[in-house]
Swiss-Prot record:
Catalyzes the conversion of S-adenosyl-L-methionine (SAM) to carboxy-S-adenosyl-L-methionine (Cx-SAM). It catalyses: prephenate + S-adenosyl-L-methionine = carboxy-S-adenosyl-L-methionine + 3-phenylpyruvate + H2O. NCBIfam families: carboxy-S-adenosyl-L-methionine synthase CmoA. Homodimer. Its EC number is 2.1.3.-. GO terms for molecular function: carboxyl- or carbamoyltransferase activity; S-adenosyl-L-methionine binding. Belongs to the class I-like SAM-binding methyltransferase superfamily. Cx-SAM synthase family. GO terms for biological process: tRNA wobble uridine modification. InterPro entries: CmoA, Methyltransf_25, SAM-dependent_MTases_sf. It is an enzyme of class 2 (transferase). S-adenosyl-L-methionine binds at Y35, G64, C65, S66, D88, N89, R195. Keywords: S-adenosyl-L-methionine, Transferase. The gene is cmoA. This is Carboxy-S-adenosyl-L-methionine synthase.
Length: 239
């Protein structure tokens, strides 16, 4: 279903409710440059890591899993038996995910606040365009929990919208991103109304800040797998 949510101002903060869930896949594809390419790239690196670290049934968490797109990408890349656990606090999103993955018997979904979850030891975690919605004071706490729950040589994927630490460059990056959205069919009003709804809800860090945050919780190896203007995909490995 096409995303037309912001044809007019919602007069409220952005939230992942039923209206958003209905159009979320279209919103992702038209709002995140190279979205599916980043999912495939992340799935590839997890698959390669699993090949090099033998586990009879590895556990993979997707936090803020929304409609389950990353699990589809993982199932296309990974041939071995895996356990996939998607956690999201939006039941409308999870209903979409369950519907899309009904033919896979290796995925289950839990409607919870992932900040409150006690994770089992896992081979991989993913936070794909999710950390930016976590309150800044809670990001380090969440990442430390993930680090402590990762098996040795396990990996964490972090996809984020980012900002530049230089005011002029940041303005130019945002302008280019808005041009991208216009080319995807969003009007000036839709872009402005969504920006208004996301204010103080989506709080981006710079690439340097995100890397420093991952290093502060214990990750010694953090790499940017992909970057387009103000979007990036990072991988961090526990050693």
């Amino acid at each position: 279903m096409k995303d037309t949510l912001f044809n007019q101002s919602l007069n409220k903060r952005f939230c992942f409710d039923e209206k958003v869930a209905h159009v979320f896949d279209d919103m992702l594809e038209r709002s995140i440059p190279y979205y599916h390419e980043m999912l495939d790239l992340g799935a590839y690196f997890i698959a390669q890591n699993l090949k090099e670290n033998i586990n009879p049934k590895p556990l993979i968490y997707d936090l803020g899993c929304s409609t389950g797109n990353f699990f589809i990408a993982l199932n296309q890349q990974i041939q071995q038996d895996i356990e996939l656990v998607g956690i999201d606090n939006s039941m409308p999103m999870l209903k979409k995910a369950q519907e899309k993955l009904k033919d896979f018997n290796n995925a289950r979904f839990e409607c919870m606040d992932f900040l409150e979850v006690e994770f089992k030891e896992a081979s991989a975690f993913s936070l794909l365009f999710v950390l930016q919605f976590v309150r800044p004071m809670q990001r380090e706490v969440l990442l430390k929990k993930i680090y402590n729950s990762l098996a040795l040589n396990g990996v964490l994927l972090v996809g984020e919208k980012i900002m530049s630490e230089d005011r002029i460059l940041d303005k130019q990056m945002i302008e280019l991103y808005y041009l991208y959205k216009q080319n995807q069919g969003y009007s000036h009003n839709e872009i402005a109304f969504k920006r208004e709804a996301l204010e103080n809800v989506l709080v981006p860090y710079s690439l340097k800040e995100n890397v420093a945050l991952l290093e502060s919780v214990g990750f010694k190896h953090v790499e940017a797998l992909f970057k387009w203007v103000n979007f990036t995909l990072l991988v961090a490995r526990k050693t």
